[in-house]
Regions:
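Collagenous Gly-X-Y triple-helix signature in extracellular proteins
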Residues: 1-176
Length: 176
């Protein structure tokens, strides 16, 4: 969704485990999804969402993508016993989605996306804080968000209300 459905906490109990489920997961796959007619709900398919994370900066969208899916060369991807994926209907955009949404002219690492070339040509850029589906693997209560200047950072899941832009996948039978 290219607009926020409002500002919300990622999780009110202080866990970065989306599959537990996190407060935001419960809301998106409950009240938010139930606002749509049954015919629309049936167009949304179950999808596998990857829950990997990273603790650091100066990385590209490609590197973030690999950590989300645990396909990079090594490192810590998840906090404790957090699962590496979750199957469901509605989640948040990946941090790599945000990185890939910038035009080819943006050659910066994601922590330097506050560059005008990166934000002016990124259709997912919004001048507001927005949650993404990306955890800090070293702290059970920390996830990432995109910040108003265009780059990203991590924050405790229960401290701030940020914008939520739901992500979903349509079933293969949907005709557009």
């Amino acid at each position: 969704k290219n607009e926020s459905i409002g500002i919300k906490y990622w999780d009110t109990s202080g866990s970065n485990n989306w599959a537990r489920p996190a407060t935001l997961n419960t809301e998106l796959n409950g009240a938010y999804l139930n606002n749509y007619a049954t015919i629309a709900q049936n167009m949304i398919g179950n999808a596998k969402y990857y829950l990997g994370g990273y603790n650091g900066s100066n990385v590209t969208a490609d590197t973030i993508y690999q950590y989300e899916r645990k396909i990079s060369g090594g490192g810590t991807y998840y906090y404790g016993t957090n699962p590496n994926s979750w199957v469901g209907k509605v989640a948040l955009m990946y941090l790599s989605d945000y990185g890939y949404a910038a035009s080819e002219e943006c050659t910066k690492t994601l922590s330097n996306y506050n560059d005008l070339t990166c934000i002016s040509n990124n259709w997912l850029f919004d001048k507001n804080y927005q949650w993404v589906l990306f955890q800090n693997p070293y702290r059970r209560y920390t996830v990432y968000r995109v910040v108003p200047d265009g780059n990203y950072g991590n924050l405790n899941v229960y401290e701030n209300l940020y914008n939520v832009r739901p992500t979903l996948y349509l079933t293969s039978s949907v005709k557009i």
